Amino acid sequence: MKYFKLVIAFLLTVGIFFVLNTKLGAIPPIGKFLNPYSGVWQNETDETTTGIISIPGLKDKVSVHYDEQLIPHVFAQNESDLYKAQGYLTAKHRLWQLEFQTHAAAGRLSEIVGEGALNHDRRERRRGMAYGAEQAIAYMEKQDTETLGFIQDYADGVNAYIKQLDPQDYPVEYKLLDYQPEAWSPKKTALLLMYMTKM
């Protein structure tokens, strides 16, 4: 009888551990989501740092000032640094929105939210925004390298922010949907702009 209780307690513990760490349909792993170290509790505050910011690849000093409405004002010595800082700050405050909208534009939303978005994805793929974004980048590679350089600087800023994130620092939406951010690219910027003009 003593061993029977031990086996039952062990099986219950293993069962609870399994359930708390398994994605159940659209529900994220509850244990992972509620983990006090890396779960949703880490998303309590969003710091806004006024002053000099440090981003890999900057040529000169870049400063950011947040006004009373928490709108960042970026001051840079050159355009390349300005676009890197803008990408970094946009990712800091809107990373999930950036990625979700580019997935929606490219017809990849079902990768994040499941089969319920398949009709949306098919419609967007027929619309051809991903192809249009590729063509826009190809045109810039041949005809407008300056703009492409700025778009690459913006992507570098977004990626600098993504690279510094640990899983516990991911925005809460990533934790809810149980996935991680992808690297940003100029194509994603073109997709985002095309998607915004569609709205």
What is each PLM-predicted segment?
Residues Y3-F10, G15-M199:
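Substrate-recognition/specificity elements adjacent to catalytic centers across diverse enzyme folds
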